[in-house]
Amino acid sequence: LSYTSEAAKAMITSPSDRKAAAASLINALGGKLHEMYFSFGDYDAVCLIEGPDDKMMAAGAMAVGAGGSISKAHTTKLMSVDDAMAAMTMAGKAVGAYKPPVG
């Protein structure tokens, strides 16, 4: 996520534990914040969040966005290696069923 300039100014003026703030919201939605890292580059912070479903994650994004302190965010859904291997097996069984466009 990236903070607005106003949020960055507020954090500099009055430092606060943003991990605790994020954990409070995520816990209220039934999720778990595994870790939060501050970063520099395209984004200001990265959070590793575990949630019961996509609805919970969307609700969290909406709640944070409604606060007005975030200028942009990016979500990457992760899967375990076991789930990825199961997907590979499924793809192997289905790959012949797909006919790419030709022309």
Enumerate the predicted regions with their spans.
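Surface-exposed beta-strand edges and their flanking turn/coil or helix-capping segments
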Residues: I12-S14, L48-I49, G60-M62, T75, ...
